[in-house]
Regions:
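Conserved ABC transporter NBD signature motif
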Residues: 63-74, 83
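Conserved ABC ATPase signature
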Residues: 141-145, 149
Length: 283
């Protein structure tokens, strides 16, 4: 059976035990296999709750009719461990994920838990550290790494166990712009090379702008879901819920207002620069 959607939520409702009102209310969305989807919204909108539901750390309200499907499996208490093998999460603070004395030990941790033979484990650790540009640090202590380097190691640890889906839960929010850009470029490359599905939970509009699809969450409900261009061209809607607009989308909006029509497939700074140069050369 061919699975087209890596993640699907149908009428998902969730209420925390100490809360009287649900934090998620009849949520419906799909994440296509092999795509990058960004989930954005203000604090308390329910973004991180969704990531915990996908990984089975939380379960939807009983008798609510909620259905969560991950990699073709309907999530329940019996198959939660099977689903967790399909999903890896990179959290905001990588220090909370380190368990090994060295970078190599840390990346090997998940493999050891799965009983992978040592020879295979050594090769896998070297391969995934090379994938994220951290092989030279295999014997380093995680505490001595920069924030960006720590996140690379965290990503390597996830890659080692070969998930189908990677959730970036505010995983670039503590990095400087340079470190953030490096991590996102690595993720984009690995997504293509390994056919990964990426769900990015973020406040960073520039990170969201790199996605194939954007879901806007507001007060436990989905406000909109479309391509980044479609979402951010609606300049008022993101601002109403406290989100800014990516610089390139602001610029495209202003150019369109001035009568310079920018094609919808122009989405990045480089694409806009190239289009404007071509436009200028025709004059």
């Amino acid at each position: 059976m061919t699975i087209s959607n890596a993640i699907e939520f149908k009428d998902v409702t969730f209420t925390y035990p100490e809360s009287q009102a649900p934090v998620l209310k009849k949520i419906n969305f799909k994440v296509k296999k092999g795509s990058w989807t960004a989930l954005i919204g203000h604090n308390g909108s329910g973004k991180s709750t969704i990531s915990k539901l996908i990984n089975g750390l939380l379960l939807p309200d009983k008798d609510s009719g909620s259905v969560i499907t991950v990699s073709g499996m309907n999530l329940n208490s019996k198959n939660v461990w099977d689903i967790r093998e399909k999903v890896g999460i990179v959290f905001q603070n990588p220090d909370n994920q380190f368990v090994g004395a060295t970078v190599g030990d840390d990346v090997a941790f998940g493999l050891e838990n799965r009983g992978v033979p040592r020879d295979q484990m050594v090769q896998t650790v070297k391969k995934v550290l090379s994938d994220v540009g951290m092989l030279d640090y295999i014997d380093a202590e995680p505490a001595n790494l920069s924030g960006g380097q720590k996140q690379r190691v965290a990503i390597a640890g996830i890659l080692a166990v070969e998930p189908e889906i990677i959730i970036l839960d505010e995983s670039t929010s503590m990095l400087d712009p340079s470190g953030r850009d490096q991590i996102l470029k690595i993720i984009k490359r690995l997504m293509s090379e390994k056919n990964l599905t990426i769900l990015s939970i973020t406040h960073d509009i520039d990170e969201a702008d790199m996605a194939d699809n954007v879901i806007v969450l507001n007060d436990g409900k989905i406000l909109a879901q479309a391509s980044p261009t479609e979402i951010f061209s609606q300049t008022e809607m993101p601002r109403q819920i406290g989100l800014d607009i990516p610089f390139v989308d602001k610029l495209i909006y202003k150019l369109n207002q001035l009568g310079i029509t920018i094609p919808k497939d122009v989405q990045t700074k480089d694409e806009l620069k190239q289009y404007l140069c071509q436009l200028n050369s025709k004059k």
